[in-house]
Amino acid sequence: MIAAIFLAILSAFIHAMGLLALLYWQTRQWPRIEADFRPRNNLPVLLIIFTAILSLHIAEMLLWAGFYSWQGALPHFETSFYYSASSFTTVGYGDIVLSRSWRLEGVTESLTGVLLLGWSAAYFFSVVSRLFEIRGDLWKRQAGQHSSAGFRAR
């Protein structure tokens, strides 16, 4: 169980460092997006963020799978990764189960997965919210420019 708690903390550390690096990259993209707000500018940013977050989750699942394989909890790495992905995402098909002595590690991975997936969802939501905010500001500016032509700005 101590190893599982260590893996949970390590997973959270990996996730935090990945999101901080992503945030650093992302904040450098905002001026360009704000200056020329178009879908062709937004889509690559969203896809890069999605891919980075997906990569973080895969790395965290690989960490847990490596632990299961290293400890002999599951027979093959492929099986370990499949079990890890199933537990991490809380799908839990049940076709592969850990032995009685490893059950708490599986539960800890599931709890870690729920928290990290939620953290990622919140991060992605904040990015999309910021894009909507930028779009709204742009529309307000455009409405203000056209108000002298008979349009009323809100």
Per-segment meaning from a language model:
Residues 14-31:
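Membrane-water interface of transmembrane alpha-helices
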Residues 36-43, 95-99:
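Helix-boundary and loop/linker segments of multi-pass membrane transporters
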